[in-house]
A protein has these predicted regions:
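Extracytosolic ligand-binding ectodomains
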Residues: 1-251
């Protein structure tokens, strides 16, 4: 192959979330935006959650542009799952949280993909963001080598904090540079062989691929909004705070 992945494949994206079973979760409602990303995660997560003994009581997709979630929130309340998880983006995750609050749905655990990793999530939701989980590929507090330094230098240069795409781009450059150094040449075949076989710790985390070029060396992190801050709660080696579970019901 000539394509090598540095980020977590969709099939493994939610691996860090499966600690939910250890926390006491028994039932899961899974909703997702009908994008390629959402549908890939839905298929993989359905299989893996069932392997871990978690019962899926609802799995439902919605158009990515949807913002009215009143009907979906009502169905989620009816199934009364311990965990509600959404494969979503910023605007739809915010809209879904608001709909759940309006409907009075209070799961023991609530999480999303992209939305909670962004500061705007809590800026818009205020206290309703408290306790919500997010799955992220990188956070500057993750203790990855160079994370704090990169975040500082990026903010100094561009005037805002780096997002995951900046980290991915920088990491891809690190990985390619390392492969060229190990190969001792820019010859295509020699560099490709290093990319295929090498182990390297980039800013985004460990790089190690299988025979198809699929990333298998790294796993995502799980954060939780606590006291208006994003705090890592899993995996254990990067956790800053213990998980709040179950969530405190709010009116």
């Amino acid at each position: 192959t000539n394509i090598f992945g540095a980020d977590t494949p969709a099939g493994d994206y939610l691996e860090g979330l499966y600690f939910a079973a250890d926390a006491g979760v028994k039932t899961v409602a899974f909703v997702y935006a009908k994008t390629d990303f959402g549908e890939d995660l839905a298929a993989a997560s359905k299989r893996k959650m069932e392997e871990r003994g978690l019962q899926l009581v609802l799995i439902e997709g919605y158009p990515p542009e949807q913002r009215d979630f009143a009907a979906l929130a009502k169905r989620l309340g009816e199934v009364n799952a311990d965990l509600i998880f959404g494969v979503s983006y910023l605007d739809d995750s915010i809209a879904l949280v608001r709909a759940l609050k309006k409907e009075g749905v209070n799961p023991k655990m609530l999480g999303f993909t992209v939305g909670p990793g962004l500061r705007e999530f809590a800026n818009q939701l205020g206290a309703d963001a408290e306790g919500v989980l997010g799955v992220v590929q990188w956070l500057r507090s993750s203790r990855e080598p160079g994370a704090q330094d990169f975040a500082y230098r990026f903010a100094q240069r561009y005037g805002y904090n780096p997002g995951v795409y900046a980290v991915m781009g920088y990491s891809a450059g690190q990985i390619l540079e390392s492969a060229i150094r190990l190969a001792g040449t820019t010859d295509h075949d020699a560099v490709r062989e290093q990319l295929r076989t090498m182990y390297f710790r980039a800013l985004i985390g460990p790089y190690n691929v299988n025979e198809t070029g699929r990333q298998q060396g790294r796993r995502n992190f799980v954060l939780q909004w606590q006291d208006n801050q994003r705090r890592l709660v899993a995996p254990e080696q990067v956790a800053e705070r213990p998980l709040i579970y179950p969530l405190r019901a709010t009116p």
